[in-house]
Curated annotation (Swiss-Prot):
Residues 6-129 form the MsrB domain. Gene3D superfamilies: Peptide methionine sulfoxide reductase. The gene is msrB. The active site is at C118. Pfam families: SelR (PF01641). It comes from the Bacteria. This is Peptide methionine sulfoxide reductase MsrB.
Length: 145
């Protein structure tokens, strides 16, 4: 992502969006926008707009954050060890904007690969399936066909 475009987008973020994506913050469980979202659509990086997750891979993990079994395209996310807060976890970031998204854990549904991408709502923007064309994400409609 172009640095000047990224800086422009960062200025538009709310405090919680900035804290989560740029300072690796975490929003409160069960008190965020998408933890119980049941609508069909895709989730894009709040900074870059790159598609990251689909509602077709979302499930209720009971943790209080949106949880997914996989990203839409693994090339759009990167992972690295996170040793903060006295734990060893795997952080998930977006490739294009380098936004902190959340963490991935090996306790997801076994029949779907066994991973749980536990993602902060504040790092995401939801595009409902009926708005994909309007928002320029028409290529992702095939996920829902």
């Amino acid at each position: 992502m172009d640095e000047s475009k990224k800086n422009e987008r960062l200025k538009q973020l709310t405090d919680i969006q900035y804290n989560v994506t740029q300072k690796a913050g975490t929003e409160r469980p069960f008190q965020n926008e998408f933890y119980d979202n049941a609508a069909k659509g895709i989730y894009v990086d709040i900074v870059s707009g790159k598609p990251l997750f689909s509602s077709t891979d979302q499930y209720d993990a009971g943790c209080g954050w949106p949880s997914f079994t996989k990203p839409i395209d693994e090339a759009e996310v990167k992972e690295h060890k996170d040793r903060t807060h006295g734990m060893i976890r795997t952080e998930v970031k977006s490739v294009d904007a380098d936004s902190h998204l959340g963490h991935v854990f090996p306790d997801g549904p076994q029949d779907k690969g066994g991973l749980r991408y536990c993602i902060n709502s504040a790092a995401l923007r939801f595009i409902p399936v009926d708005k994909l064309d309007d928002e320029g994400y028409q290529a992702y409609k095939k996920i829902f066909e």
